[in-house]
Curated annotation (Swiss-Prot):
HAMAP family: Ribosomal_bL31_2. The gene is rpmE2. SUPFAM superfamilies: L28p-like. It comes from Neisseria meningitidis serogroup A / serotype 4A (strain DSM 15465 / Z2491). This is Large ribosomal subunit protein bL31B. GO terms for cellular component: ribonucleoprotein complex; ribosome. The keyword Ribosomal protein applies. Part of the 50S ribosomal subunit.
Amino acid sequence: MKPNIHPDNYRTVLFFDSSANEGWLIRSCAETHGKTMVWTDGKEYPLFSLDTSSASHPVYTGKQRNVNTEGHASKFNQRFQSVMSSFRKDK
């Protein structure tokens, strides 16, 4: 790595996904606002909290929710059926 090309706050940061209870140590300049956490190696690292990651996102975990599109289409048709029938009567 070339010297003097990274900002002063380039350090090891713990990125932690609380919903999956998983974390990763990555060198980063991410702002952690003074939050820290003790990791499994016993050392304390700056903490960057994640709402979702590959460990918890349904696309990556395979736990996707199937949406019943037929139900959505029938609701749409019911809602606008009266509008469409009055439109057809006017012509």
